[in-house]
Amino acid sequence: MAWRVDSEIDGRSTRAEFEVMLWSDLVRTSMRSGILATYGQMLRTAYIYIASGTLWRLMQLRKGPVIAALYPVVMLVAQAAVALALAYAAGAVLRLWHPGLFWLGMAVIPWVLMGFRRYDNRLFAHYLMHDYAYSAAARGAHPRDLEARLDEFAMRVLAALRSDVDEVLLVGHSSGAHLAISLLADIVRSGAVQSGGLTLSFLSLGHVVLTVSFLPNAHSLRRDLKHMSAQRQMT
């Protein structure tokens, strides 16, 4: 996905070209998207983080990464708790007519959960859970299809570095932040970034880098983080 913005500021013309590396399709094809599937992913991901000691390591850090890691889990558990509470309340009302009707209140649960799912574009509980489950499925290693997507986008960045632009800015947001670091490290290792040459800048937004880097199989990400921490030609 790409687009271009032309502008004129104080009599000077500028042009910015934007390209986005889409990978949400990889998550969708590998993760079932139903409500029950999301809760199953939550339990599996929680087990991986707890059993591997990743959650304990995150707890030793400042609260930002901890909040990022726990938010979808807490939100999904809260949604289930609300659904159960409303089901109990509905059952209590039905029991006034007949004691055997109490369990009919359980029919409220799927409707409440579907209601929360409908507003996930604001709550991001299912969205983030799918992202985290995708990264945790291989315990921090990049799946092959994702590696191929990164290699393809790296070629786009290298092409931009060889063009006549003034600057190339690589932005990694949320779950894409750790992917951007691996992409950036590969570009730097290729020798495309030279001192005094075209400026390559990097901006990361979010705390997901830490939630992935502590996973047991995130060897390549930890190697990339170590490599980039020693770079001096980056902005």
Segments from the language model and where they lie:
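A composition-biased, non-transmembrane "mature-region" signal
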Residues: 1-19
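The conserved beta1-alpha1 loop
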Residues: 1, 22, 172-174
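Short, surface-exposed, charged/polar-biased interaction segments
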Residues: 39-42, 87, 91, 223-230
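Generic structural motif
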Residues: 8, 24-26, 207
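Transmembrane alpha-helical segments and their cytosolic interface motifs
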Residues: 69-81
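Juxtamembrane "helix exit" motif at the C-terminal ends of alpha-helical transmembrane segments
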Residues: 78-101
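Serine-dependent carboxylesterase/thioesterase catalytic core
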Residues: 139, 144-235
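Active-site catalytic motif of lipid deacylating hydrolases and related acyltransferases
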Residues: 14-72, 94-165, 212
